[in-house]
Design a protein with these regions (language model features):
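N-terminal Rossmann-like dinucleotide-binding module
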Residues: 1-43
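Structural motif
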Residues: 5, 84-85
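Short, structured coil segments at secondary-structure junctions
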Residues: 26, 59, 102-103
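Hydrophobic beta-strand scaffold residues
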Residues: 30, 62-63, 107, 135
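N-terminal beta-loop-helix "entrance" segment that forms/cooperates
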Residues: 37-59
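Short acidic-hydrophobic, aromatic-tinged amphipathic segments that line or gate anion-handling sites
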Residues: 63-69
């Protein structure tokens, strides 16, 4: 069986286990990672790579860091083959309809809390703040 191609969009530590799991799965090939640009962190304002970028480079996966994915999407899409799936885990930007229609099979979002109670960011922190006795993860196909 041919491996399904994935473009992975994610940024924080929360997204790294999902990226690693997809890379380890023999049914998938993560061909590209898209993450937020490196940002100044701390008092020293040291330029720091997002955790997903660090993991992707360790795994040998090419990384793109557009400031605004929607604005740069046409250039990105023209430079690589359409993936079977676009997997988004805590990427940090709203995606345009053009981005959502890019994958051949589906754009998939992994959200850090069960929907609909856990809408928005940061879902895990909201669960703790509201004293939720349990929480979960929502996996959904994005359409709009």
């Amino acid at each position: 069986m041919e491996k399904r191609s994935i473009v992975f969009c994610g940024t924080p530590d929360f997204a790294v286990p999902s990226l690693r799991a997809l890379v380890q799965d023999k049914n998938f090939n993560v061909s590209l990672v898209i993450t937020q640009p490196d940002r100044p962190v701390g008092r020293s304002k040291e330029l720091t790579a997002p955790p997903v970028k660090t993991a992707a480079l360790e795994l040998g996966i090419p990384v793109l860091q557009p400031e605004k994915l929607n604005a740069e999407f046409a250039t990105i899409a023209a430079s690589i083959d359409r993936p079977d799936f676009l997997v988004v885990v805590a990427y940090g930007q709203l995606l345009s309809q053009a981005v959502l229609e890019w994958p051949l099979i589906a754009p998939i979002n992994v959200h850090g809390r069960r929907l609909a109670r856990g809408r928005g960011a940061p879902p895990i922190e909201h669960a703790v703040l509201h004293g939720d006795a349990e929480t979960g993860i929502a996996v959904q196909r994005m359409v709009k």
